[in-house]
Amino acid sequence: MIPRLTDAERAALVDLLPEWSLAKDRDAIERRFAFADFSEAFAFMTRVALLAEKHDHHPEWSNVYNRVTILLSTHDAGGLSARDIRLAEAIDGLA
Amino acid sequence: MIPRLTDAERAALVDLLPEWSLAKDRDAIERRFAFADFSEAFAFMTRVALLAEKHDHHPEWSNVYNRVTILLSTHDAGGLSARDIRLAEAIDGLA
């Protein structure tokens, strides 16, 4: 079992990942991205897919034309863990 | 404005696209796919993305690890059109 984030780690999220917000009905973080068109959105998704495989941690995500929504949570933790923070930081590094 | 499917065309969907079902709260069709892992799921998504660009018609879709859900509807028709059928048939051709 992977440990969930502590209260102190959660409090630090606002500064650490200012573009991400806590999901409403899940112990998860999410971020929405908008691009010029589908081609740019899917190019970004491809880079995120490579990151996900590298981290062995995968997003729950959706795409509608130029928009991409990414939700991160850790199944083996039953909620947010350090793995989500690391992947979110890596994704932010692309954007 | 693109014409929506007629009643006769809708009645034919069961035979034409047996793997697809009507969405519950949208005038749309959807299909769920399951793969061995994320890598296979995303490889499939990449092929669907190429089809979407070729057809100039894009899915609303989501992915969680090995699962992919695709919903097709035509914004410019306010619901299902022949474009959705053509793209669904092309996607079935990959699977």
UniProtKB/Swiss-Prot annotation, chains A, B:
GO terms for biological process: tetrahydrobiopterin biosynthetic process. Keywords: Lyase. Its EC number is 4.2.1.96. Pfam families: Pterin_4a. It catalyses: (4aS,6R)-4a-hydroxy-L-erythro-5,6,7,8-tetrahydrobiopterin = (6R)-L-erythro-6,7-dihydrobiopterin + H2O. This is Putative pterin-4-alpha-carbinolamine dehydratase. It comes from Acidiphilium cryptum (strain JF-5). SUPFAM superfamilies: PCD-like. One of its GO terms (molecular function) is 4-alpha-hydroxytetrahydrobiopterin dehydratase activity. It is an enzyme of class 4 (lyase). InterPro entries: PCD_sf, Pterin_deHydtase.
